[in-house]
């Protein structure tokens, strides 16, 4: 349902005169990063985080990617939505597709201050969420930087039906596939993410 929610959200925002920077399919941390990097007034991620496929919603951040919650603006947004009385719009906002992932990858690479003396083998479990494409971009960046890391991908392609189960690595029953892959491939470690990859579990 994310695409339908995103379409409706963009339509509502632009009809109110808001310009929308469309990042495409991203993870929550990428939205936080882009909101600050692009000096946007706010950011919205369409996500149900680590919940099952029939859930969905929005995560909101304000200036400087500060989270918006009940104690700093969310209740006011709720009240405005419930009143459903908005001033007429002078102009419709625009939609500006933008790929901020290269900047995000470069920011991650700046955290690497040393290079392993041998190739690190990492099992990476995207849980059929949005981590898969981001990991591919990170993998390319690591190769360009000459950092010897090998990703062993499982449940990699985004699929909102989550055929491998709810993408919540905090649940013990969802850890087995990553654990077994680490053993099978003699990996140095494994990492499993939730659906919008703002939380992870290390093996």
What are these regions (language model features)?
Residues 1-55, 138-202:
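N-terminal small/polar loop signature for handling phosphorylated ligands or for N-terminal nucleophile
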Residues 56-185:
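Gly/Ser/Thr-enriched, mixed-charge loops and adjacent short helices
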């Amino acid at each position: 349902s994310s695409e339908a929610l995103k379409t409706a959200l963009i339509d509502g925002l632009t009809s109110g005169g808001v310009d929308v920077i469309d990042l495409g399919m991203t993870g929550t941390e990428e939205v936080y990063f882009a909101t600050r990097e692009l000096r946007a007034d706010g950011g919205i991620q369409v996500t149900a985080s680590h919940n099952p496929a029939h859930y969905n919603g929005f995560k909101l951040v304000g200036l400087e990617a500060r989270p918006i919650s009940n104690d700093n603006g969310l209740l006011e947004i709720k009240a405005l939505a419930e009143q459903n009385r908005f001033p007429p719009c002078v102009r419709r906002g625009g939609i500006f597709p933008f790929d901020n992932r290269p900047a995000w990858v470069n920011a991650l690479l700046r955290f690497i201050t040393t290079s392993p003396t041998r190739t690190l083998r990492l099992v990476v479990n995207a849980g059929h969420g949005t981590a898969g494409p981001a990991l591919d971009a990170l993998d390319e960046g690591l190769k360009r930087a000459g950092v010897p890391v090998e990703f062993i991908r499982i449940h990699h392609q985004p699929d909102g039906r989550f055929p491998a189960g709810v993408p919540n690595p905090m649940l013990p029953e969802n850890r087995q596939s990553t654990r077994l892959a680490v053993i099978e491939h003699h990996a140095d470690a494994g990492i499993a993410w939730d659906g919008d990859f703002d939380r992870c579990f290390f093996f």
